[in-house]
Structure formats: structure tokens, C-alpha cells
Amino acid sequence: MKSMIRNASVAAAALALGLSASATVRADDKPTLAFVVNGASDFWKAAEAGVKKAQGELPDYNLELKYPEQSSVAIQQRLMDDLVTAGVKGIMVSAVDPKTSTDGLNKIASETALFTTDSDAPQTKRVAYIGSSNVDAGKQAAEIAKKAMPDGGKCLGFVGLLGADNAKERIQGMKDGLAGSKIELVDVRGDDIDQARAKKNVEDALVASPDITCMVGFYSYNTPRIYEALRDAGKLGSITVVGFDDDPITLGGVKEGTVAATVVQQPFEWAYQGMKLMASYLKGDKSGIPEKGLIIIPTKIIGKDDVDAYAANLKAMQGK
């Protein structure tokens, strides 16, 4: 994680869009809305593009995307507290650990309009959640595994935050989807969004668990770290890899056939639709808020046949 925060591409994008880990709000009369992520990752580049598009349609607002200095509950909470102090009118957050952040999130919700994304916190006073159904995404991962491994096998999963709702729901969804099949998800290893640790978890598993025939990367960077560890060990193609999200390494693996397929989310839409939803809500228009406060943006499976078209569309959304 620390190395990714220093990543030049993320920093450059942050400077270009006015994104940072600080909570400085622009000194003008426009209300500010903030999109707060759970840690530095290329996964959020699409969300940056979504915020940028929404900004073009919301000239009466300042829109910002904020990266915490580290993927930590305390650091993320401090960032949101600083944003509230600076006068931000609405915050959309991917909480690092919703289960242990109820009090902190409720504090923010009492001071500004709070929305969640990516990993919901339904036990809080958030207005609404906009993002994926992580259970459904997990079930799609199971479909990938069953198609790639008709004779069955043992899968080992890797994820950033074991305690986060999005991780728990994806894992449970995959287990549900594998029920009755010959495939078992035997364990999931966490890394606290530490890139070096993520790769080492895979390397250690290759030594300690030679009977594993499938690896699942539940967070956006996990599949690239799986790919790199398998490549370095000369085992690409001998272990089935099930991916999540659309890191370039993951999409490259799908194209070459070393990643069976990947379940992709739509963070661009979370940010684009989410910022517009917050703006409407602050103007008194609550028509976009469903009764249960859940706005689900569907996930989809990207395989070898459609990876090129998907990658081209992703680049277009990001303005590349």
C-alpha cells in the first residue's frame, strides 16, 4: 500500500483532477462533494474519470476524490473529519472496515450527507449505497471456476481486507455458487492492501499448498499479484486463475488465457452517478433514493472473447 501511494501515476492523476489525501476545500461559494476511497489503487482511476465527467455536468459544485494516506480505519476517519471541518456538504465513501466504523460513520452522517459505495455500511445512518452486489459478483466468480474446472478442484482466495463487507460478501457469494459442485474454496488470505504482502501470500501458498489448483483474486490488485507470482514460479497456465476487476495485468492475462476470466465492476458509474445523486439529494430531490437505499450497478464477466472490446471501452472512459 505504501509503495502504491507513492506511485507516480496515481499522484499525477490526483494533481490533474484536484485529488489528494488532504481535506482542503476550494475557497469559493460552491458546495463541495467528496468521493473518499479506501486506499490507493489503480482500481479507482475509473472513479476519477467518473468524478471528472460529473463535474462537467455539475458546474454549481466542486467535486473531489480523496485518497487516504494509508488503508486504515483511523486515517480514513480523520480524512472525513477534516473534510467535514472544511465544509464539505456530502461524502461518498468506500469504508475500509464498515463493521468497526459504525460510530465514526454515524458521526459523519450527523454532520453531512453520507453515502457509501463499493463496501456498504447498512447499519449506519448513510443515505444510500451505490455499487455492486458483491454476493452476485462472488457467484459470478464461481461460474468462472466451474466453467474452467469441470472436473473440480481446490481454490485458494486472496483479498485485501478480510473484515470488509465487500470481501465477506464476495467470498460468501462464491461459496454459495460453488455449492453442490466439485470445487471448494478452502481458504482466503488477507493482506491489508499491502502489495508486497499480497504477492508473498501467493508465493507462500505455492510452497505450502501444492494441492491447490485454482487461485482467486478478490480485490483488484490481487489477480495481478497472483499472475506475477505464478509467472515467477513458472506455473502460469497450470493453476486456474479467477479474477476480479480490470487491472491491465488481469485483462492481459484474460487475453492470453492465463486468467480464466474476471468479474468487473463499474467504479466509473459509481462515481458519476453517485456524485449526481448527492447533488440532487442536497437540492431536496430524494426521488433517486430507493426505499431500501440500495442502488446496484451490475457486475459482469469478461472472458477472452470480449476482453479487447472491454479494454478499449475502459480506455475511452478514462480519456486515454
Give each language-model segment a name.
Residues 1-12, 21:
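Bacterial N-terminal signal peptides that target proteins for export
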Residues 3-6, 26-320:
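A residue-level marker of the well-folded mature domains of exported/periplasmic proteins
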Residues 16-25:
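C-terminal segment of classical bacterial N-terminal signal peptides
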